[in-house]
């Protein structure tokens, strides 16, 4: 998406009561990431928070970064590997991190995050498995649980 369009949408979100703007995703391209963040930051008065797909989506233009651990993945890169790679940049920018347990739940369709993170979604009707994952995230000190279906 073009940076100006992104900034316009962020303004609309703020006007309609959003508490913050998440920027990122599983397949976001790096080529206009910094420009998008800077423009959004200039155009809204609510927190701009990075929702990183991989380690290099770290920027001083954001207010914070969701430090995502895909707790439904058994891929060590998604559990800790990307965090280790991002840590020096996070420290350099003195960026606030928000520990986030990312849980993929079965939706009936394969999703980008499921594919990119090598994650096995939690079956929709297996509440005990979802609760166990959520508790594990809590006990690991995660501040937020983000569920994606």
Which residues does each PLM region occupy?
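Alpha/beta enzyme core
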Residues: 1-149
């Amino acid at each position: 998406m073009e940076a100006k369009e992104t900034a316009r949408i962020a303004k609309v979100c703020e006007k309609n009561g959003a508490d913050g703007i998440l920027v990122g995703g599983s397949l976001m391209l790096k080529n206009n990431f910094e420009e998008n963040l800077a423009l959004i930051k200039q155009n809204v008065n609510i927190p701009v928070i990075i929702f990183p797909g991989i380690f290099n989506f770290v920027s001083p233009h954001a207010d914070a970064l969701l430090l995502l651990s895909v707790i439904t993945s058994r891929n060590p890169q998604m559990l800790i590997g990307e965090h280790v790679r991002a840590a020096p940049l996070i420290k350099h920018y003195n960026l606030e991190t928000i520990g986030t347990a990312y849980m993929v739940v079965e939706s009936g369709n394969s999703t980008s995050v499921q594919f990119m993170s090598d994650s096995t979604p939690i079956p929709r009707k297996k509440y005990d498995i979802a609760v166990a994952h959520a508790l594990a995230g809590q006990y690991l000190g995660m501040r937020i649980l983000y569920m994606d279906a």
